[in-house]
A protein has these predicted regions:
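Positively charged n-region of N-terminal signal peptides that target proteins for export
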Residues: 1-5
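Early exported N-terminus immediately downstream of N-terminal targeting peptides
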Residues: 23-103
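Low-complexity, intrinsically disordered terminal/linker segments enriched in charged
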Residues: 162-193
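Short beta-strand edge/turn micro-motifs at domain boundaries
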Residues: 141-169
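Boundary at the C-terminal end of the N-terminal hydrophobic targeting segment
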Residues: 18-22
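Sec-dependent N-terminal signal peptides
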Residues: 6-10
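Surface-exposed, charged secondary-structure patches
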Residues: 101-142
């Protein structure tokens, strides 16, 4: 399941095209098409050149996620507001590093799997959307849903739900427990390892 989760997150995140007036489901469809062509073009190099892969992830993938919003959601209002600006910046950077490290290898596992997207559901606010999808992979389909926010005319993903399990909720439980026992500085250090 971890490998499938990593693959699906990598599929979602990879795109280098600027989407300014795209619908959220269109943004996700284009992202999957982009990963397919990116992997086709660079698969061998991705498997052997970790620095190149990390650079591609950081320049093309991570900008499509709202890492700062994800950080706030994961840590919660109390912890976030108690942190200094420097700690907030350090956490966001460390969390992005961890996300990149965790998911960059799974990009090479993409092998043209088919994805079906349902039309997006608007959120309570016009800049929020929810998109349901199904990844058709050998061994069984996986339901993957996305929560997106529109900022500066661009859609960004801030949560991914795999078979009903929120990525943010999983991180939230682990990270908050770590902070309660060891403090925020310890969590930041562990994310950088």
């Amino acid at each position: 399941m971890i490998k499938k989760t990593s693959l699906l997150l990598a599929l979602l995140m990879t795109t280098s095209i600027a989407f300014t007036s795209e619908t959220p489901d269109g943004f996700l469809k284009d992202s999957v098409e982009e990963i397919s062509s990116l992997v086709t073009k660079y698969k061998d190099r991705f498997e052997t050149d970790e620095e190149f892969l990390r650079d591609k992830m950081n320049s093309s993938v991570m900008p499509k996620l709202d890492i700062k919003l994800m950080s706030k959601i994961i840590l919660g209002k109390k912890i976030w507001t108690d942190m200094s600006e420097s700690q907030k910046d350090d956490f966001v950077e460390a969390f992005q590093y961890r996300m990149t490290s965790t998911y960059m290898k799974s990009i090479t596992a993409f092998d043209g799997e088919k994805v079906v997207f349902l039309p997006y559901e608007p959120g309570k606010r016009e800049n929020i959307a929810y998109v349901k999808s199904k990844y058709l992979i050998p061994g069984g389909d996986i339901a993957v849903d996305y929560r997106l926010i529109k900022k500066s005319e661009e859609w960004k993903v801030y949560d991914i739900i795999f078979d009903g399990i929120s990525l943010m909720k999983n991180y939230r439980a682990d990270f908050r427990e770590h902070v309660s026992h060891n403090g925020i500085e310890s969590l930041i250090t562990s994310l950088r390892e």
